[in-house]
Amino acid sequence: MMVFAFWKVFLILNCLAGQVSMVQVTIPDTFVNVTVGSNVTLLCLYTTTEKSLEKLSIQWSFFHNKEMEEPISIYYSEGGQASAIGQFKDRIIGATNPGNASITILHMQPADSGIYICDVNNPPHFVGKNQGLLDVTVLVKPSKPFCTIQGRPEAGHPISLSCLSAFGTPSPLYYWYNIEGNTIVPVKESFNTATGVLVIGNLTNFEQGYYQCTAINSLGNSSCEIDLTSSHPEVGIIIGALVGALIGAAVIICVVYFARNKVKSKQQKNLNSSTELEPMTKVHHPQQSEAISADGVQLEGTLPSSIHAGHNTEPTTTAVLEPEYEPNPPLETTTQPDPEPEGSVPVLAPEAEIQPHPELDPETETEPEPEPEPKPEPEPEPELEPDPQSGVIIEPLSKAGEDTVKA
């Protein structure tokens, strides 16, 4: 180590210079075991040929493990002034009497296990054995081990049981037992006490039931239990949970699917109904005009037959009113005597009846709306020639809704 090499070189130089002053360090207990959480005193005694102790220095260093390259300083005292450093701050109390370089460490923890170095110097005394080493181990009771199963716990399958404690110093040994009622019996199969692994070649050849693993060291023991059966309940629980989750997901998907289809079907039905009702509101006026025009043609066609029917009787004249194209014109029945020649008979104009609107053909509800036809222009009425037998001439009236009869 570099520290030791330095002191050896320094010792050789002092010897060559003729110096004979020496410091001697003694370690009573090289190996120290301490229980976790307790206090420990690390003894380090020294002697010096120099009477004066004013320049005496004491230093403690620590190796957490042997792989550390350099030790770390945890305590230093010189001239009556002392201080603790690092993870040991406020946890170290140093001795004050001459010849004693011991320290007491409070509340030891597992991380405090390692190598401690006591180094004493009293200039000009640099010759002699001024260092001492102590190996300190913090003892920890085994923590509760973890029992696990490797392999499938089914008949005919090889499996193994393992047992491991996270903490425990010294390292615990592991033992397997079979629980039969209130009795704990060591297993017949062989197992590794250092690793805690119990190998079972064939589950059918192994007695089923509860098994216990116990971790033991010098401070105590801890145990864990495991249930080993061919039909392990944990496997059934996991399978049941998976099946239940899949069924639940399938039900939710089906409900959402049918609900969306129902909403879409209802929306489509409402859309079709509104499309069918649109042409029904636009078919009244064109058919009404056509109906009025047809009635006018029918009245016009009946005029000659009425006149010819009375040719062997007294001469009579029937006036026919042509329907107006204006909607619902008020019609009056009047008789206006015009200057007529003798022998003519006035004829009363019949009262025009307002034709009711024709009922809609049910077929038009489903047919698209017809395009409105252009309104036909009224044809000029032909002039009526006098009937040679009756001598009556029909002329249209000058006012709406009236006719004049001339003989």
Swiss-Prot record:
Residues 361-371 have a biased composition (Acidic residues). GO terms for biological process: epithelial cell morphogenesis; maintenance of gastrointestinal epithelium. It is found in: Membrane. The modification Phosphoserine is found at S273, S274. Residues 268-289, 318-407 are annotated as: Disordered. Keywords: Disulfide bond, Glycoprotein, Immunoglobulin domain, Membrane, Phosphoprotein, Repeat, Signal, Transmembrane, Transmembrane helix. The chain crosses the membrane at residues 235-255. This is V-set and immunoglobulin domain-containing protein 1. It comes from Mus musculus (Mouse). The gene is Vsig1.
